[in-house]
């Protein structure tokens, strides 16, 4: 996992070049948006339990067969595993948001996750629906204008939405 700064330096070093002015401008923008990024991660972290719980409630309301006898989330153990997995995905989305780099999400969370779910008989479409519900809830919390750094957060919103969509597609 590299943060955006390490990645830019590594790429320039590999090419034997100085960091280009366009890369420097992009890094300046990241620094300028650092407070917004930190606020977003803080909000997702502080509301992680409600994000996961509400997404799970929505998923099970939309797909009640999951919690019916014989369903993939039937029994407390399976339900707990489902909630744990949703929480792990959310945690890695916060890491990606904080660093501005999806590699931590892809490499340490999503890599091989679909294959694991297939092997366990977990319906990927249901997991994806839960992840998308978490994404909507997280973005709503992040974009709530009360008590955060003012300014345009649309690019950060799109980035967070992309991380959740990447996670959803990885398990479908």
From Swiss-Prot:
Post-translational modification: Contains two covalently linked bilin chromophores. The chromophore on position 82 is added by the phycocyanobilin lyase CpcUS, while the chromophore on position 153 is added by the phycocyanobilin lyase CpcT.
GO terms for cellular component: phycobilisome; plasma membrane-derived thylakoid membrane
Keywords of this entry: Antenna complex, Bile pigment, Chromophore, Electron transport, Membrane, Methylation, Photosynthesis, Phycobilisome, Thylakoid, Transport
Main localization category: membrane
SUPFAM superfamilies: Globin-like
Leader peptide range in chain numbering: none
Superkingdom to which the source organism belongs: Bacteria
Membrane topology: Peripheral membrane protein
Protein family: Belongs to the phycobiliprotein family.
Subunit structure: Heterodimer of an alpha and a beta subunit, which further assembles into trimers and the trimers into hexamers.
Role description: Light-harvesting photosynthetic bile pigment-protein from the phycobiliprotein complex (phycobilisome, PBS). Phycocyanin is the major phycobiliprotein in the PBS rod.
Name used for this protein in its record: C-phycocyanin subunit beta
Gene: cpcB
């Amino acid at each position: 996992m590299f943060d955006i700064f390490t990645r830019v330096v590594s790429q320039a070093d590999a090419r034997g070049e100085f960091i280009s002015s366009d890369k420097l401008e992009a890094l300046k923008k990241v620094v300028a948006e650092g407070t917004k990024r930190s606020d977003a991660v803080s909000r997702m972290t502080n509301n992680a339990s409600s994000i996961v719980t509400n997404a799970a409630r929505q998923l099970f309301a939309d797909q009640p067969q999951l919690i019916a006898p014989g369903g993939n989330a039937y029994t407390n153990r399976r339900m707990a595993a489902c909630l744990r997995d949703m929480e792990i995905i959310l945690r890695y989305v916060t890491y990606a948001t904080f660093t501005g780099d999806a590699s931590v999400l892809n490499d340490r969370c999503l890599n091989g996750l679909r294959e694991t779910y297939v092997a366990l008989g977990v319906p990927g479409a249901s997991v994806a629906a839960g992840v998308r519900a978490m994404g909507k809830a997280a973005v709503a919390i992040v974009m709530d204008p009360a008590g955060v750094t003012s300014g345009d957060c649309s690019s950060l919103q799109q980035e967070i939405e992309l991380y959740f969509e990447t996670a959803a597609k990885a398990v479908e």
